[in-house]
A protein has these predicted regions:
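C-terminal motif of bacterial Sec signal peptides marking the signal peptidase cleavage site
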Residues: 12-14
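Extracytoplasmic metal-acquisition and chelation regions
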Residues: 16-283
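Sec-dependent signal peptide recognition
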Residues: 2-8
């Protein structure tokens, strides 16, 4: 049935690529990327987000409206480390033969990830590169270059906005460093290990409850409880799309607090500050 639907979509939208020369559509994999494209382009392009608000890369299925936008897109800006990107690449290029595909994370040193039972990760690397300002500067530069290539007539405006964005990112990095500087307890408890790049930049240690994409074993939970009590860790982060049962159980054991974060939120800057504020409460 899925193959039939895909073929039907392919037939319906393949002809759309003929008008792509006048298109101002840019496709991105996840919502935070839209934030950065918007920061660089203003209202000069339309952004098609493949994983829409409230959805997850874990169970991604393309919508007909997204296929239509992809058929008109000049470029697809990938994160480059998400499994669905590889899974759908051939199908997307079948619909739009001229689609330029750009790995926005090119130049980032990837962090090895665990085996993910939900298949979010492509290969063996952690995909959450957008959750650290240092990596975002690389992503922003790759995004700028791709946008200038696709829309050279707007290069001047893009450069002005890009430089303004870099200033915001540098300012945010400084704020985070300042808030975390007094911190002696530099451990982060998190259900799904999404903060590895953040931890690398700001010299923190990420401790995941999840193991290889699976629920924590009783032994692992006991080890985490012992560690949290010993080091006075009281904050447990969990992404909003995950079941909070184990995190809540752990919080009761250590007298802690479960904090829900949304790595896929559009407002990237606010997410970074909210995460930092909570980490900074752990003296």
């Amino acid at each position: 049935m899925k193959k039939f639907v895909y073929l039907l979509i392919l037939i319906l939208f393949a002809c759309q690529a003929k008008n792509k020369e006048t298109s101002n559509i840019v496709s991105v994999s996840i919502l935070p990327q839209k934030y950065f494209v918007d920061q660089i382009t203003g209202d000069l392009v339309h952004v098609n987000v493949l994983v829409p608000p409230g959805s997850s890369p874990h169970n991604y299925e393309v919508l007909p409206s997204q296929m239509k936008a992809l058929a008109q897109s000049k470029v697809w800006l990938q994160i480059g480390l998400l499994t669905f990107e590889n899974a759908w690449k051939i199908k997307f290029t079948d619909i739009n033969k001229d689609l330029k595909i750009v790995n926005s994370s090119e130049g980032i040193i990837p962090i090895p990830g665990s085996i993910d039972a939900d298949q979010e990760h492509s290969g063996t690397f952690d995909p959450h590169v957008w959750l650290a300002p240092a990596e975002i500067k690389i992503i922003a530069k790759n995004t700028l270059n791709a946008l200038i290539t696709s829309f050279p007539e707007h290069a001047g405006s893009f450069m002005v906005n890009y430089n303004r964005l870099l200033q915001k990112i540098d300012s945010l990095s400084g704020q985070i460093e300042q808030k975390l500087a007094p911190l002696k307890n530099r451990n982060i408890l998190i259900f799904h290990p999404a903060l590895a790049y953040y931890a690398r930049q700001f010299k923190l240690e990420q401790i995941p409850l999840e193991m290889d994409g699976k629920e924590p074993s009783p032994k692992h939970m006991k080890d985490i409880v012992d560690l949290a009590r010993k080091q006075n860790i009281r904050i447990i982060f969990i992404q909003k799309e995950f079941d909070a049962e184990n995190a809540l159980q752990l919080s009761r054991e250590i007298g802690g607090e479960v904090v829900v974060i949304d790595p896929l939120d559009y407002n990237w800057e606010k997410q970074m500050l909210d995460i930092t504020e909570k980490i900074a409460t752990q003296k």
